[in-house]
From Swiss-Prot:
Family per record: Belongs to the acetokinase family.
Cross-referenced InterPro entries: Ac/propionate_kinase (IPR004372), Aliphatic_acid_kin_short-chain (IPR000890), Aliphatic_acid_kinase_CS (IPR023865), ATPase_NBD (IPR043129)
PROSITE patterns (UniProt xref): ACETATE_KINASE_1 (PS01075), ACETATE_KINASE_2 (PS01076)
Class in the EC hierarchy, top level: transferase
Name of the protein in its database record: Acetate kinase 1
Pathway: Metabolic intermediate biosynthesis; acetyl-CoA biosynthesis; acetyl-CoA from acetate: step 1/2
Gene expressing this chain: ackA1
Listed Gene3D superfamilies: 3.30.420.40
Annotated PANTHER family: ACETATE KINASE
Assigned GO CC terms: cytosol
Residues that, per the record, bind Mg(2+): N9, E384
CC cofactor: Mg(2+); Mn(2+)
Keyword Ribosomal protein attributed: no
GO MF terms, alphabetically ordered: acetate kinase activity; ATP binding; magnesium ion binding
Length: 398
């Protein structure tokens, strides 16, 4: 147990954590705190069986981290004794960070400086980093950036049609997120299809409270739906994704919204939350589709947007699409959403295997299209934690 890495993945409304052997890939502990900031905030973990505890109404990342360290890890003294390093998923590195780095005060400051580009995530990452440094002061911490995988995007994909000096002077461009997940899915899909990674063309749909699509050509990211920030692209839990930019001016000039109110609305009150005006939880939308108007409306918009992105990204792959892959909490578990999206892609020759699709959830992976489908669609469980553990072990020299 000499190369154990504690991996922390602080999302906008969740905290995934794991203790991973960076050599064997074995996970000794896995857990998820979810629905943070909501009344039903809870934490689940697997360690000598499955466990669950309520964190309290509105509990945030700090409470989840404290519970993890004081109640879960503390129950196994050998874990703390054998932890060699701590790896952190960081959503946005801007142009400051193009690869994983050892964390010091300068890196923390750099991550904080990028918070304007990921306002729901980077502040949560800082909380995780500082809590980890306090709990385990002798261990090295490593930051693994979601933006790194997308550094291979060509200029035509990452530039916005704005005055060019905004890029050269202020680095305003598309960066993309979920890169660690997109990288892992690329590797696994290549193995499943028995193709070399550098010959693989896929479109990967990472669907969770945050969601993005990535066009992967010859194993490298060539386009992705998130942009300068995680706000662009798909409909998400609380984020709007693509909108007409002029809506912002209309809200400000005509309706009198402040800039702060608009920013808060687009990042925290839109997406599924805004469309339902009930919740950001996709499970409510799925369970009530066809029963409640707000759920039906939200799911239709979500699937319409996603299918458009997948279809559009076929244009970046120069005539060959080896697979469409689904991952993330929604991608891995929502058979209805996958079916609705794939049915909208019939023009690509996609044909859903309804039975296989229904079975592919709760950790079960596999092909969810028929043998007649021109393009296979697959459910593949992501493992960002393993990628983070491997990078952490390398940089911490453990």
């Amino acid at each position: 147990m000499s190369k154990l890495v504690l991996v922390l993945n602080c999302g906008s409304s969740s905290l995934k954590f794991a203790i991973v052997d960076a050599v064997s890939g074995e996970e000794h502990l896995t857990g998820l705190a979810e629905c943070l900031h909501l009344p039903e905030a809870r934490i689940k973990w697997k360690l000598d069986g499955k466990h669950e505890a309520q964190l309290g109404d509105g509990a945030a990342h700090e409470e989840a981290l404290a519970f993890m360290v004081e109640s879960i890890i503390a129950s196994k003294p050998e874990f703390a004794a054998n932890l060699a390093a701590i790896g952190h998923r960081v959503v946005h590195g801007g142009e400051k960070f193009t690869q994983s780095v050892l964390i010091d005060e300068t890196v923390v400051k750099g991550i904080e400086d990028c918070s304007a580009l990921a306002p729901l995530h980077n502040p949560a990452h800082i909380i995780g980093i500082k809590a980890a440094q306090k709990a385990f002061p002798a261990l090295k911490n490593v930051a693994v950036f979601d933006t790194a995988f997308h550094q291979t995007m060509p200029e035509e994909a990452y530039l916005y049609a704005l005055p060019y000096n905004l890029y050269t002077d202020h680095a305003i461009r598309r960066y993309g997120m979920h890169g660690t997940s997109h990288l892992f899915i690329t590797r696994v899909t290549a193995e499943l299809l028995e193709k070399p990674v550098d010959e693989l063309n896929i479109i990967n749909c990472h669907l969770g409270n945050g969601a993005s699509v990535c066009a992967i050509k010859n194993g490298k990211s060539v386009d992705t739906s998130m942009g300068l920030t995680p706000l662009e692209g798909l409909v998400m839990g609380t984020r709007c994704g693509d909108i007409d930019p002029a809506i912002i001016f209309h809200l400000h000039d005509t309706l009198g919204y402040s800039v702060e109110k608009i920013n808060n609305m687009l990042t925290k009150e839109s997406g599924l939350q805004g469309l339902t005006q009930v919740t950001s939880d996709c499970r409510f939308v799925e369970d009530n589709y066809g029963k409640k108007e707000e759920a039906t409306r939200a799911m239709d918009v979500f699937c319409h947007r996603l299918a458009k992105y997948v279809a559009g990204y076929t244009a970046t792959l120069e005539g060959r699409l080896d697979a469409i892959t689904f991952t993330g909490g929604i991608g891995e578990n929502s058979a209805p959403i996958r079916e609705m999206v794939l049915n909208r892609l019939a023009i690509l020759g996609v044909e859903v295997d309804v039975e296989a699709n229904l079975k592919a959830r709760f950790g079960k992976e596999g092909v969810i299209t028929t043998a007649n489908s021109r393009v296979p669609a697959m459910v593949v469980s992501t493992n960002e934690e393993l990628v983070i553990a491997e990078d952490t072990a390398r940089l911490a020299a453990i």
